[in-house]
From Swiss-Prot:
Requires a divalent cation for activity. Displays highest activities with MgCl(2). Its cofactor is Mg(2+). It catalyses: a 1,2-diacyl-sn-glycero-3-phosphate + CTP + H(+) = a CDP-1,2-diacyl-sn-glycerol + diphosphate. Keywords: Chloroplast, Lipid biosynthesis, Lipid metabolism, Magnesium, Membrane, Nucleotidyltransferase, Phospholipid biosynthesis, Phospholipid metabolism, Plastid, Transferase, Transit peptide, Transmembrane, Transmembrane helix. Its EC number is 2.7.7.41. It is an enzyme of class 2 (transferase). Pathway: Phospholipid metabolism; CDP-diacylglycerol biosynthesis; CDP-diacylglycerol from sn-glycerol 3-phosphate: step 3/3. InterPro entries: PC_trans. Its main location: plastid. It is found in: Plastid, Chloroplast membrane. This is Phosphatidate cytidylyltransferase 5, chloroplastic. May be involved in the synthesis of minor phospholipids and in modulation of IP3-mediated signal transduction. Promotes the biosynthesis of plastidial phosphatidylglycerol (PG) which is required for structure and function of thylakoid membranes and, hence, for photoautotrophic growth.
């Protein structure tokens, strides 16, 4: 026989099943069962929706319903809490990743600035020293650049569409390129040397085992020209043009033990102006592109813009004019502007040429020799063609 609940004569009180397991303030979509207070006069009916109706109630059923609703409410609360925790963890991970990226960029920027200043001071001292010091430094840079170039040629991106030269021949060509600046200092010109080297390399390619490819010959000849022959013009400019620059203030105050006024030759002044112009061109182009860059310059280098290029041109010409006034060369303003324009175009053309090679190779940097700057070829690409233009300008303009 089912248990009964006796009803007293007092006013019944509403009771929700959800109130058995949760706070009474919580609203519930379920219907209410009104459980009256205890009395001895009546058997135990229940009031449903304020109507006096005898209902047989099993205490286990009430407990099961209350327990099920409690579990459902607890699961909903736990799921919401887990979702909030996951969201907070995701936000924390995103914030930490942003902090890591900012810290990495700051560290990269510090490396670039530190090594950039170190390289700049070292190059300045080498240029001022001239002679064998300058020539050996150029030869070392040429050797490293040639090795990086031939590694780019052998990379997957370029090698898929062509047959690269054999590795032993790439090493031989790198050594030949490094010897060219030294031969330039000793003989004054390397026309016969470069012709002989090109002939020997071409014969080695044609007589190799297997089927020789034109791509091997073309990439090797371009490597000799790009990495070996063109940098030799810096040696010819610094060490070959020995006429002193007159009326220069820094030359008159230069210590006699370091060569005196005769140390400041046309070649030294021209190379200092060219180097500073290239640095100004790269710096102003970078800053101008960051601030005003909208129109892409060329597809092989998507980050370069016309606005940045114009800023680089203005910066190169401005630095050239300032240095020409302090170093008293060139004398005329028109010649100074022309020299600045040549330095700018040589810098841009060299940069774009190396960008084309890296794009075909499918790499971002030519190497990882210099922390924060990439390889040596990434640092000297703007100087490769500029040396030939600067030397030609000085020879045509006259000392």
């Amino acid at each position: 026989m089912a248990p009964f609940v006796e009803v007293c004569r007092y006013k019944p009180l509403p009771l929700s099943l959800s109130s058995l397991c949760t706070c009474p303030c919580r609203s519930s979509p379920r219907k209410y069962l009104i459980l009256p207070q205890f009395s001895e006069k009546y058997p135990k009916p229940l009031l449903s929706h304020s109507r006096f109706t005898p209902i047989s109630v099993n205490r286990r059923v009430i407990t099961a319903v209350a327990r099920a609703e409690s579990n459902q409410i607890g699961d909903d609360a736990n799921s919401k809490e887990e979702h909030n925790i996951d969201q907070e963890l995701q936000n924390v991970e995103e914030d930490s990743s942003l902090d890591d990226q900012k810290q990495k960029s700051r560290s990269q920027f510090k490396k670039r600035v530190t090594f950039g200043l170190g390289i700049g001071l070292s190059v300045g001292g080498i240029v001022l020293a001239g002679g064998w010091v300058f020539t050996v430094a150029v030869a070392a840079a040429v050797l490293l650049s040639a090795r990086e170039y031939f590694e780019l040629v052998r990379s997957k991106g370029i090698a898929q569409g062509m047959t690269p030269p054999p590795r032993y021949l790439s090493r031989v060509c790198s050594i030949i390129c490094a010897l060219m600046p030294i031969l330039t200092l000793y003989f004054g010109h390397i026309d016969i040397s470069i012709t002989s080297a090109a002939f020997v390399v071409a014969m080695a390619l044609l007589l190799q085992r297997g089927n020789p490819r034109f791509s091997q010959l073309s990439s090797t000849m371009f490597g000799l020209f790009y990495c070996g022959y063109l940098p030799c013009f810096w040696v010819k400019l610094r060490c070959g043009l020995t006429a002193p620059v007159l009326n220069t203030g820094i030359g008159r105050s230069w210590p006699t033990i370091l060569g005196g006024q005769a140390h400041w030759t046309v070649g030294l002044v021209a190379i200092l102006i060219s180097f500073c112009g290239i640095i100004a061109s790269d710096t102003f182009a970078f800053l101008g592109g960051k601030a005003f860059g909208r129109t892409p310059l060329i597809s092989i280098s998507p980050k370069k813009t016309w606005e940045g290029a114009f800023a680089g041109l203005v910066g190169c010409i401005s630095i050239t004019i300032l240095l020409s006034k302090s170093l008293s060369w060139p004398q005329s303003l028109v010649s100074t502007i022309a020299f600045g324009v040549l330095n700018f175009f040589g810098s841009v053309f060299g940069d774009l040429t190396e960008s084309m090679i890296k794009r075909d190779a499918g790499v971002k940097d030519s190497g990882s020799l210099i922390p924060g700057h990439g390889g040596i070829l990434d640092r000297v690409d703007s100087y490769i063609f500029t040396g030939a233009l600067a030397y030609s300008f000085v020879r045509l303009h006259g000392v």
